[in-house]
Amino acid sequence: SYFAKEAYTLTPMQTITLPAIHREETPAFRYRQTYSYNNDDPVYKLWFRLEEPKDMFIENMWVHTFNRILPSDRFGKEHPEYYSFINGEHRPGHNSQWCLTNPKVFDAAVRQLDSIFKAHPDMKMISVSQNDGNNTNCSCPACKEVDEYEGSPSGNLIRFLNKLAERFPDKEFSTLAYLYTMNPPKHVKPLPNVNIMLCDI
């Protein structure tokens, strides 16, 4: 259960006595987080055992990571085709998305991720997720075809993540159901090492 910060009272005590407890649990999912202004209170986070993204996600990559993985200021000039096709042109930029049907984007992302994974061999989870911004997804003919078949741009995203999950089966990939990817796809299903973070705003 999640409660607001105001729903509990913490009374400071000098001594706390607890009975002997032996309790083991296997969580239904590996990472649990809720995000609100209450998270700024460290006691609240501790009480509800909310995890810090930096403790779980490689290089603290937990949301809106497209531009961290393939920065547009590094790749955009030479490879504008990596980025969203909108109103007749590819538009690299900090908030641009990727053209997820372009195999060169997949290859470039694999190279970047492989380097990140090698630098952090003891960590398993990373987010590969859209940049912040609505209606910025790629509308090239290939992406539009997948979007129409899947009934949502989330289909393109899950297909891309599934390919990454197959390429790196020992890693876990997180992504977002957020804004234009909020609705689930009709056909494709995420692989076991792909998890979806619901971000309903």
Residue spans for each PLM region:
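Alpha-helical scaffolding within the catalytic cores
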Residues: Y178-H187
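Feature activates predominantly on carbohydrate-active enzymes
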Residues: S1-R159, K163-D170, S174-A177, N193-C199
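Short, surface-exposed basic-aromatic patches at helix termini and helix-loop junctions that form
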Residues: H187-N193
